[in-house]
Design a protein with these regions (language model features):
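Residues on the lipid-exposed face of transmembrane beta-strands in outer-membrane beta-barrel proteins
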Residues: 30, 57-65, 77-79, 107-113, ...
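Extracellular/periplasm-exposed beta-strand and loop segments of Gram-negative cell-envelope proteins
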Residues: 33-54, 78-106, 132-162, 181-204
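Short glycine/proline- and aromatic-enriched beta-strand/turn motifs that initiate or cap beta-hairpins
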Residues: 18-65, 212-214
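Residue-level detector of the transmembrane beta-barrel scaffold of outer-membrane proteins
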Residues: 23-27, 72-74, 122-126, 175-177, ...
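Cleavable N-terminal export/targeting peptides
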Residues: 1-22, 214-215
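Outer-membrane beta-barrel channels and translocator barrels
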Residues: 19-22, 66-70, 116-120, 171-174, ...
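Outer-membrane beta-barrel "beta-signal"
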Residues: 23-25, 171-173, 201-215
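Structural signature of Gram-negative outer-membrane beta-barrels, strongest in the C-terminal barrel
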Residues: 114, 121-135, 158-164
Length: 215
């Protein structure tokens, strides 16, 4: 995964440095509101909560060019750590269900419209659309406290689309934006009885800050 991040960042940086009138954005963001899809396998109980166990974060690099007055178009790559859903406890059977950690590396097209106003603080609208390479840190775990056993179920988080839309402001090349984002995903489990695949999209509102370099 780290190799993918470094390769993507190196590629975008080279494109930015090789092109004239190019903008390079370096940003970091925090998920101030989060929601996972709730998984309910066939003939089974819910295995996760929609809330996250902690705040997610991301590190992003984007490169754009102005293709029309006030309109920028480009590409981006981001490392996004979503954490995992809060553990689900079944008090009737003294069982705890732990979901694996969920991370993504989306590669996407991005567009930014700078609203033309006579001010040092420049508002803008922004949208992203791309593909999310998703990864989970381990397997689904059923922890039976009564028996003192932990059962692991082989699991995988499949890739999917990524998109986001929002608005922000720019001041002296510093940028800050607030965006609604979704990473589409499927949660797949494998047992001796077969495989299951359920929607496991991650939705959130992300507050990002960063700096724009002009080349």
């Amino acid at each position: 995964m780290i190799k993918k991040i470094l390769l993507g960042m190196t590629t975008l940086s080279c494109i930015a440095l090789a092109s004239q009138d190019t903008n390079l954005y370096l940003k970091t963001g925090a998920d101030i509101w989060q929601k996972f899809d709730v998984i309910t396998p066939r003939d089974s109980e819910t295995i996760n909560r929609k809330k996250a166990d902690r705040m997610g974060y991301e590190l992003t690099i984007e490169t754009t060019r102005e293709i029309y007055p006030n309109l920028e178009l480009g590409a981006g790559i981001s490392y996004q750590d979503h954490g995992s859903t809060k553990s689900l406890n079944d008090k009737d059977f003294d069982i705890k269900l732990d979901m694996p950690k969920f991370t993504s590396i989306p590669i996407y097209l991005t567009t930014k419209y700078n609203i033309p106003i006579n001010s040092n603080i420049k508002p803008y609208l922004k949208a992203d659309l791309g593909y999310s390479f998703n990864h989970n840190s381990g397997d689904l775990k059923f922890i039976d406290y009564e028996l003192g056993e932990t059962i692991k179920v082989s699991s995988d988080i499949k890739n999917g689309l990524y998109f986001g839309i929002g608005a922000g402001v720019e001041y002296n090349n510093f940028v800050a934006d607030l965006m609604y984002k979704i990473n589409k995903a499927k949660f797949e489990t494998s047992t001796p009885y077969g495989k299951t695949k359920d929607d496991f999209d991650y939705s959130r509102v992300t507050l990002s800050v960063g700096y724009k370099f002009n080349f």
